[in-house]
Amino acid sequence: MRLTYPTTLVLQALLQGHHHGFDIMDATGLPSGTVYPILRRLDAEGCVRSRWEKPGEARKEQRPPRRYYELTSHGRSVATEAVDRYRALQEVPAPVGRPGR
C-alpha cells in the first residue's frame, strides 16, 4: 500500500472522526480529485468500509446523500502507523550548513 503524505492526511482525518468526503476535504485541505481516489483505494484495500446515508436525512437538508467512510480494524492499524511515521519524520532536525562541508 502506498502511504503518501495525502493518504496519511486522509487516514488521520478518519482517525479524528471525519467520515464523509467533504468533511475530509475540509479537515485536510486536499481537493476532491485527491481525496476520493484515496478513499476508493483504501476501500479496495480493506482499510475502510463505506455506506450511503439514508436518503431521508439528505432530503431534510436539501442536499445529495453522503457516503460515509469508517476505518476497519486493519485500517486503524495502518492509519496509526502512517501518522506515527510522518510525525517521526517531522522531528528529524534539518541539516546544518551546506552539504560536503
Model regions and ranges:
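Short beta-strand element of the conserved SAM-dependent methyltransferase core
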Residues: 27, 69-71
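Amphipathic alpha-helical dimerization/coiled-coil segments
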Residues: 1, 73-101
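Short, charged/polar surface micro-motifs in flexible loops or helix N-caps
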Residues: 16-20, 44-45, 75-77
